[in-house]
């Protein structure tokens, strides 16, 4: 009977250790996914900032060109 208890205890202990290791790996994978999502959102934000600045520059250039055309037409 004592041998059976020891075997059962050993099986339960090893199962618990295995479960703990699996949960830890799962948490690490989730953390990596969250970190990748953060990196992607930072890249998107950076890209949108560049597009915004380019748009502003193009808008200013177009406004200046239209203003010059109007000034030339008035003269």
Curated annotation (Swiss-Prot):
<keyword id="KW-0964">Secreted</keyword>
<dbReference type="Pfam" id="PF03032">
    <property type="entry name" value="FSAP_sig_propep"/>
</dbReference>
<dbReference type="GO" id="GO:0006952">
    <property type="term" value="P:defense response"/>
</dbReference>
<dbReference type="GO" id="GO:0005576">
    <property type="term" value="C:extracellular region"/>
</dbReference>
<feature type="compositionally biased region" description="Acidic residues">
    <location>
        <begin position="30"/>
        <end position="41"/>
    </location>
</feature>
<feature type="signal peptide">
    <location>
        <begin position="1"/>
        <end position="22"/>
    </location>
</feature>
<keyword id="KW-0165">Cleavage on pair of basic residues</keyword>
<protein>
    <recommendedName>
        <fullName>Cruzioseptin-7</fullName>
    </recommendedName>
</protein>
<dbReference type="InterPro" id="IPR016322">
    <property type="entry name" value="FSAP"/>
</dbReference>
<keyword id="KW-0878">Amphibian defense peptide</keyword>
<comment type="function">
    <text>Has antimicrobial activity.</text>
</comment>
<dbReference type="InterPro" id="IPR004275">
    <property type="entry name" value="Frog_antimicrobial_propeptide"/>
</dbReference>
<keyword id="KW-0732">Signal</keyword>
<feature type="region of interest" description="Disordered">
    <location>
        <begin position="25"/>
        <end position="44"/>
    </location>
</feature>
<comment type="similarity">
    <text>Belongs to the frog skin active peptide (FSAP) family. Cruzioseptin subfamily.</text>
</comment>
<feature type="propeptide">
    <location>
        <begin position="23"/>
        <end position="43"/>
    </location>
</feature>
<keyword id="KW-0929">Antimicrobial</keyword>
